[in-house]
Amino acid sequence: LTPDGYNVMLRGLMGDAIKFTRIKYGNGTPGDGANALKNPLLSLKIASATRSEKYVTLSVSFKNVELEITGFWATEIGIYVEDPDDSTKELCYCIWEETEVEKADYINPNVERLLASQYDFVVFVSEAENVSAALGETLVYATVTELNNHKNDKNNPHKVPQEQTGLGHVENKA
């Protein structure tokens, strides 16, 4: 946790909301006590959030061909929350840092080959009860679970009329 993140978590334990907003990737080295990434290069909205006992799992996903950046080694990743005192601002809740560049992930916007990436981050929130995330539109595709849920939805989720399916003459017994 960053110093700001620690304060947000303590306030969350006292009943304030903890609202995760985005995840940023950079190629800097923030160092101890940092409240922000040293060199943020990519900012992604959260695609999904799942709460467990003392943690929240945040997922982000993207396709390399949609990135408007040059390639970089992601040596720092920051998870951001809404500032509890000013909802128009964000605070860095926690930072992950890789000091050995060769162990970091390379974010490659190379358009010659499509790479779809999903990252899941398990973030400690202790016993804070009011935890949420501002979800953005994913930049990739539906997950297998989402596709299976849609496939198994027998309530005509696309609202296709019987006539369009060639079943206009069949009586609806549902």
Predicted feature locations:
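N-terminal assembly/attachment segments of tailed bacteriophage virion structural proteins
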Residues: 1-137
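Fibrous stalk/shaft segments of extracellular and virion attachment machinery
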Residues: 129-174
